[in-house]
Curated annotation (Swiss-Prot):
Family the entry assigns: Belongs to the venom metalloproteinase (M12B) family. P-II subfamily. P-IIa sub-subfamily.
Provenance organism: Bitis arietans
Recorded GO MF terms: toxin activity
Protein name: Disintegrin isoform D-2
Superkingdom of the source species: Eukaryota
Tissue expression as described in the entry: Expressed by the venom gland.
Keyword Secreted assigned: yes
Disintegrin domain residues: 2-83
């Protein structure tokens, strides 16, 4: 089935989906188009801060046990597993 903008599910072709335009509180996401607002790189994620990717080498997951700290890449909002 085709993606439905405004259902709060990130589907194929959507960059974000923050509910209906009346209910969306996300300044990084255009609720009418389900695309990021101009100048925004992201709208969520451990490596996203105020609509921008966090800088490379920013710790996004603290070391535990035998694992090392995990760091943002500066190119994604996801925190990669580096162990």
């Amino acid at each position: 089935s085709p993606p439905v903008c405004g259902n709060e599910l990130l589907e194929e072709g959507e960059e974000c989906d923050c509910d209906s335009p009346a209910n969306c509180q996300d300044r990084c996401c255009n609720a009418a188009t389900c695309k990021l607002t101009p100048g925004s790189q992201c709208n969520y994620g451990e490596c996203c801060d105020q609509c921008k990717f966090k800088k490379a080498r920013t710790v996004c997951r603290i070391a535990r046990g035998d694992w090392n700290d995990d760091y943002c890449t500066g190119k994604s909002s996801d925190c990669p597993w580096n162990h």
